[in-house]
From Swiss-Prot:
GO terms for cellular component: cytosol. The lineage of its organism: Eukaryota, Viridiplantae, Streptophyta, Embryophyta, Tracheophyta. Pfam families: TPP_enzyme_C (PF02775), TPP_enzyme_M (PF00205), TPP_enzyme_N (PF02776). This is Pyruvate decarboxylase 3. It is an enzyme of class 4 (lyase). Keywords: Decarboxylase, Lyase, Magnesium, Metal-binding, Thiamine pyrophosphate. Substrate binds at residues 48, 135, 497. Binds 1 metal ion per subunit. Belongs to the TPP enzyme family. It comes from Oryza sativa subsp. japonica. Its cofactor is a metal cation; thiamine diphosphate. Mg(2+) binds at residues 464, 491, 493. GO terms for biological process: aromatic amino acid family catabolic process to alcohol via Ehrlich pathway. Its EC number is 4.1.1.1. It comes from the Eukaryota.
Length: 587
């Protein structure tokens, strides 16, 4: 289901209508709160427990309900929306919807995204009655869903009493924003339309007090870091993914400009700092880094990591050649210098901003980079009619994103991770992928949500195996009038799994992907789909997608050989496989 005719883009800004005391309802209050924190679209799947609530969401002038094909994609869409807008929301029904969306909530939790998951719950009169209800697992205890959500959300509100509903809703939404994590709000199905005095006044807009640094701790951290960096001959800066949650991207850029240090980004921080910075040297990803980047980072005698996440994927099976005693690690609220000391209650944005004012300029690492850097060789080309290679595909994607029409690139879990990392992003072009959680199929729903939150076109690179998990919501993209460009890389299987551990389970049934998208299109909305097998066909397809079909959702199936993978995936897969295969420690 979809309100406002299902048109594309976010609804126009509308004044929040203040209800009279006679129609001030829980549903209306929740809807207004969502608008106040920046949500214009709620991704939903209807069910009998949430229908009345959805009516109230639709009635809110500043809010659109976007109906999705399944709850998992609704959650992924809210994830993508939160990446672009700063907060996202989804609405599903009790248990059958809640447990389906749970995987997406786990991904949002791992990526530090404020996501408001709203569940229509049982009638308030049924709690504690020992009754058996549908959409449950057949027990009179209705808390199973709540218990599943508890580890994956930072706050849980079960609203089955109007007296504290106002407080629970406000507390849940504010906690999501403050903690930058998902929250769970369950609303009994009989409550959204009931007036209550606590909702009768105009809700005061949220003002969340910013977290402040302890000034003594901040200055001590600065002094220790400056002394540490001043002793170094060739220090470097490395951006990490927690720059987003700390809202410290601008402060990091200021530090990069002031320090003169060479600047790299961890793979999951791509897009969080401009790649047009004068001393940007690429992606630091251990053995699969951008050419010459790892050599500079790992040979540095000091490195400042801002918001890093070191896991088995980002460290290439724990094989990065980094030393703790050389590192300053800046987390959203904490700074650790070498093996110690550590300083708590230090906000990353404050720390980086103040450090930029006092740091001594040192360009040695970047000077070394310029000395060893060898420009990339001749761009790959295919002979006329030759089977298309993936590196040739990404040569053309690089050219395509160079203009101003592309707002972001999204990479699905798989070889697209590695190929998209090599794209040089122009100023203002975002980049998103789900590295910490790595759930295949994420990008379809996330593309839906991200594209709904921005005006520019979004490019997505998706493998065939991942696409088969969540393909249905291409339908919702069409209903919303989105204009994204999807490159479906058809190489016959789960390529990333093949390079970690091969087996017959990594081979999938081939689909007629173009036929599938045309069937979903069914003559409604603007859609164009094609299949390409050689470079000439690819060039023609991109020309059409960016020309005559620029106002359409464009789907380009790229047929590739099953063994056509990036060298980075081959290296990364072997190292992750080795990490996974470590024998048990002796007892």
């Amino acid at each position: 289901m979809e309100s406002n005719g299902g048109g594309g883009g976010s609804p126009k800004e509308a004044a929040v209508v203040v209800p009279s005391s006679g129609d001030a309802t829980l549903g209306g209050h929740l809807a207004r709160r969502l608008v106040q924190v920046g949500v214009s679209d709620v991704f939903a799947v209807p069910g009998d427990f949430n229908l009345t609530l959805l009516d109230h969401l639709i009635a809110e002038p500043g809010l659109r309900v976007v109906g999705c094909c399944n709850e998992l994609n609704a959650g992924y869409a809210a994830d993508g929306y939160a990446r672009a807008r700063g907060v996202g929301a989804c609405a599903v029904t009790f248990t059958v919807g809640g447990l389906s969306v749970l995987n997406a909530i786990g991904g949002a939790y791992s990526e530090n995204l404020p996501l408001i998951c709203i569940v229509g719950g049982p009638n308030s009169n049924d709690y504690g009655t020992n009754r058996i209800l549908h959409h449950t697992i057949g027990l009179p205890d209705f808390s199973q869903e709540l218990r599943c959500f508890q580890p994956l959300t930072c706050y849980q509100a079960v609203v089955n009493n109007l007296d504290d509903a106002h407080d629970q809703i406000d507390r849940a939404i504010s906690t999501a924003i403050r903690e930058s994590k998902p929250v769970y709000i369950s609303v009994s199905c009989n409550l959204p339309a009931v007036p209550h005095p606590t909702f009768s006044r105009d809700p005061v807009p949220y003002f969340l007090s910013p977290r402040l640094s302890n000034q003594a701790s901040l200055h001590a951290a600065l002094d220790a870091t400056l002394a540490f960096l001043d002793k170094a001959v060739k220090p470097v800066l490395v951006a990490g993914p927690k720059l987003r949650v700390a809202k410290a991207g601008g402060a990091f850029v200021d530090l990069a400009d002031a320090s003169g240090h060479a600047v790299a980004a961890m793979p999951s921080a791509k897009g969080l700092v401009p790649e047009t910075l004068p001393r940007f040297i690429g992606t630091y990803w251990g053995a699969v880094s951008t050419a010459f980047c790892a050599e500079i980072v790992e040979s540095a005698d000091a490195y400042l990591f801002a918001g890093p996440i070191f896991n088995d994927y980002s460290s290439v099976g724990y094989s990065c050649l980094l030393k703790k005693e050389k590192a300053v690690v800046v987390q959203p609220d904490r700074v650790t210098v070498g093996n110690g000391p550590a300083f708590g209650c230090v906000m990353m944005r404050d720390f980086l901003s103040e450090l930029a004012k006092r740091v001594r300029k040192n360009t040695t690492a970047f000077d070394n980079y310029k000395r060893i850097f060898v420009p990339e060789g001749q761009l790959p080309e295919c002979e006329a009619g030759e089977a298309l290679r993936v590196n040739v595909l990404f040569k053309h994607i690089q050219r395509m994103i160079g203009g101003t029409e592309i707002g972001a690139v999204m990479a699905e879990t798989g070889d697209s991770w590695f190929n998209c990392q090599k794209l040089r992003l122009p100023e203002g072009c975002g980049y998103e992928f789900q590295m910490q959680y790595g759930s295949i199929g994420w990008s379809v729903g996330a593309l839906l949500g991200y594209a709904q939150a921005v005006q520019k076109r979004v490019v997505a690179c998706i493998g065939d195996g991942s696409f088969q998990v969540t393909a249905q919501d291409v339908s919702t993209m069409l209903r919303c009038g989105q204009r994204s460009i999807i490159f479906l890389i058809n190489n016959g299987g789960y390529t990333i799994e093949v390079e970690i551990h091969d087996g017959p389970y990594n081979v999938i049934k081939n689909w007629d992907y173009v036929g599938l998208v045309n069937a979903i299109h069914n003559g409604e909305g603007r859609c164009w789909a094609t299949r390409v097998r050689c470079e000439e066909e690819l060039e023609a397809a991109i020309a059409t997608a960016t020309g005559d079909k620029a106002d359409s959702l464009c789907f380009i199936e790229v047929v590739a050989h099953k063994d056509d993978t990036s060298k980075e995936l081959l290296e990364w897969g072997s190292r992750v496989s080795a990490a996974n295969s470590r024998p048990p420690n002796p007892q």
